[in-house]
Amino acid sequence: MGEHGGLVDLLDSDLEYSINRETPDKNNCLSQQSVNDSHLTAKTGGLNARSFLSTLSDDSLIEYVNQLSQTNKNNSNPTAGTLRFTTKNISCDELHADLGGGEDSPIARSVIEIQESDSNGDDVKKNTVYTREAYFHEKAHGQTLQDQILKDQYKDQISSQSSKIFKNCVIYINGYTKPGRLQLHEMIVLHGGKFLHYLSSKKTVTHIVASNLPLKKRIEFANYKVVSPDWIVDSVKEARLLPWQNYSLTSKLDEQQKKLDNCKTVNSIPLPSETSLHKGSKCVGSALLPVEQQSPVNLNNLEAKRIVACDDPDFLTSYFAHSRLHHLSAWKANLKDKFLNENIHKYTKITDKDTYIIFHIDFDCFFATVAYLCRSSSFSACDFKRDPIVVCHGTKNSDIASCNYVARSYGIKNGMWVSQAEKMLPNGIKLISLPYTFEQFQLKSEAFYSTLKRLNIFNLILPISIDEAVCVRIIPDNIHNTNTLNARLCEEIRQEIFQGTNGCTVSIGCSDSLVLARLALKMAKPNGYNITFKSNLSEEFWSSFKLDDLPGVGHSTLSRLESTFDSPHSLNDLRKRYTLDALKASVGSKLGMKIHLALQGQDDEESLKILYDPKEVLQRKSLSIDINWGIRFKNITQVDLFIERGCQYLLEKLNEINKTTSQITLKLMRRCKDAPIEPPKYMGMGRCDSFSRSSRLGIPTNEFGIIATEMKSLYRTLGCPPMELRGLALQFNKLVDVGPDNNQLKLRLPFKTIVTNRAFEALPEDVKNDINNEFEKRNYKRKESGLTSNSLSSKKKGFAISRLEVNDLPSTMEEQFMNELPTQIRAEVRHDLRIQKKIQQTKLGNLQEKIKRREESLQNEKNHFMGQNSIFQPIKFQNLTRFKKICQLVKQWVAETLGDGGPHEKDVKLFVKYLIKLCDSNRVHLVLHLSNLISRELNLCAFLNQDHSGFQTWERILLNDIIPLLNRNKHTYQTVRKLDMDFEV
């Protein structure tokens, strides 16, 4: 009774239930409960069933299958008891007050319809074990049916816009509210939201509605979106989802944030004169507003402006949908994959013996041009050639993705904030901000590449980006290459692309090397072409470019070149001042040679790989996501969930390209100590310190459990507090194609237990396929006796499942002998055998076995270091390799030199050198043995030779040479023996 006493009523109705039960086994109930919970987790958790099963070890998987099959048997043949309940007529004060009647209300009629539809199954329910989980599951199912009936009843009276106001919102109402609970329930359901009658887990709810909260509830709901009922009322009235922050009950306003004193709220909704609802009535329900009172709203814009918290399951989807860089990287990767999979076999392979011309083609401010051509009617008055135009998400602190050349003439650049760009414009000039049109960007890019293929004048088309390509044309030996021919080709290409993209212009750089084609492209912009070959290079050409116009020259390299060569202003100045040796000394050998060749108009070997072996250069080598906006976590649990979602997203992409990964990398951006908690850019990253950590997985894999667990472990090794985290990147490196031989390195140990066919057939149908697939993945075959590894069928690869002593298996002769004994003696013998067996199974037997293993280990260690079968390379001293003979030699050496003025200096150096070699090969224990030997000899001869100079010399050698050597290498000795010591005489 105690387990069901706290159940929450779904519709404030009275439940009468009676339990007819026998006394069940408590342990059995607990085990069944745990299996049910794990089954529920596998079905409805954050991971799918396959991911859940893959995280289990072999033994855990078998135990889970056996318990689940046993639970399923018990549920199909109940013995513990049954629960019978009946639902009375629904009537409450709030229902009459808000809707004007009991059974005529839409919710009451919905419940009655559900009861009538379920009346035929009452006999089945009486004979079923009714658990707490089943009760809440049926409640949730009944709620879903009730809400669907309500929506179907008024679907013709609700506009498509207002029916999506609360899309993706899961709302729970806490306590008394005005309007009432049922009225708010109607508003939520009829306008696209989901209503929760009970709060089983706060993770499932997005908003909590309450009129007032006590202190305890305020603390409990401090990290959740708790709003007043006016938020629902005003959102329905405005026909759009209003910011919940304006209606928050728990959040405290920032000191710098102004309070909204003049915020207009609505306490009630204007209702029709008739509130009773009949099937034939034309009036709308109390949760609906007349259509003419609803202001039109663009749902696309509403969704675009919706901000999703980083702990929301839809955060990654929302983030990538609005990320320009994500679209760029995805399109670029798709272009390269398409080139490798479809077009590479169609192109001519280029060699170093071919004569070719490079056409480097690039759009002029691609995003700004496409956004202008596809602009809405509200921007129809702007002129692309006269007005400064930028493409961005919003205003103020939004980053500028692209700008036209008019805006660039005022100093505006890509990546600049809109507010900063507006300050650079003179008075009277207004900056025009156009939104992203990702679909049009992709269409224009596809038209660009299809036009290049249709021209059929190139032997190779290499995709660099969605708006940039390198095209190669091989010149036959019998055709003379002229600038006139190349100029005609450039004009033809530009004209065809302009027509194919409906108004987008491109610039072309034409040359006989990649680096010169790139520089010529820079000179040709905007909307032009330039033809420059190695044979006609001039000082005027080199004077047109800055140092960072060369490929591979960034900010760091630029500063080194300026400091080394007296701040050259152009490439022509650098060509006059540099020498190859000075260049290599400044920026390194490899980069120095690359810059040297570029200044001669030539390509280095690494750059030429894209022409000679494009498959190797363009194939995907890594897969990653990088989130640096909206990252605000409260605890480690949220971070773990976010990492799991990121890994799941990357694994889906990894499986799409049919690859596995053998190395993963986690990169973090942690807020700087002196940086503000909230940066100027809303939900931005601000000033951060970057950290990264990589891990090798051993063998390539695409298992979620392995990768997600390792990623979370990497996060803990970096030690970043969740509240200080501002950016997070997950990366899969060393991608490998999935093949049949990938599992050759996997080692599968046999199960300690087995699953019988009977137990397997008793499993629930919804998980039987997943478990069977998991067994197939682990290379196990189902046999009549159970599940065993097919690796056991091979004697060469067989493993000993358990080590059985001979005495554990009674022979037939022993049984016959026991049967011939008298009854009393036979009983005594059996009793003694049982005692002996118990002794063997006690801790005493384990202790004796442990002592025996330790002695064997010490003997193996001795043989390992000093025996004839030692794996170490022998270290000689005086042409002796056996340590025992070396000890005898040292002992004799000490004894003979004590009374003779001590050892010779060169002999001491040779001896110390021998000791150092022992330490370097991790044989410090041998050095310790020699030091003890010398110390022991000195102690024995102290009475006779303590006044001799030889005795003092050996003491000095021991104190100044041998003991310090031991202390410097004591960590090796401590690591093996777990000791903490200092060596002293």
UniProtKB/Swiss-Prot annotation:
Please list the residues that bind Mg(2+) 2.
362-363
Where Mg(2+) 1 is bound, by residue? 362, 467-468
The question of whether Ribonucleoprotein is a record keyword is answered with no
Residues that hold dCTP according to the record: 324, 362-366, 402-408, 414, 467
Q: Which segments does the entry list as coiled coil?
A: none
**Keywords annotated in UniProt:** DNA damage, DNA repair, DNA synthesis, DNA-binding, Magnesium, Metal-binding, Mitochondrion, Nucleotidyltransferase, Nucleus, Transferase
Cofactor(s) named in the record: Mg(2+)
| Location in the cell | Nucleus; Mitochondrion
Write out the ranges of the annotated region (Interaction with target DNA).
Answer: 319-329, 395-397, 554-557, 620-628
Any one GO biological process: error-prone translesion synthesis
Q: Where is this site: Interaction with target DNA?
A: 681, 692, 694
The UniProt record lists the keyword Nucleus: yes
Q: Per the database record, which ranges form the UmuC domain? A: 358-554
Q: How does it assemble?
A: Interacts with REV7.
More about this protein: Present with 521 molecules/cell in log phase SD medium.
Instruction: State the protein's name.
Output: DNA repair protein REV1
Traced from the root, the source organism's taxonomic lineage reads: Eukaryota, Fungi, Dikarya, Ascomycota, Saccharomycotina
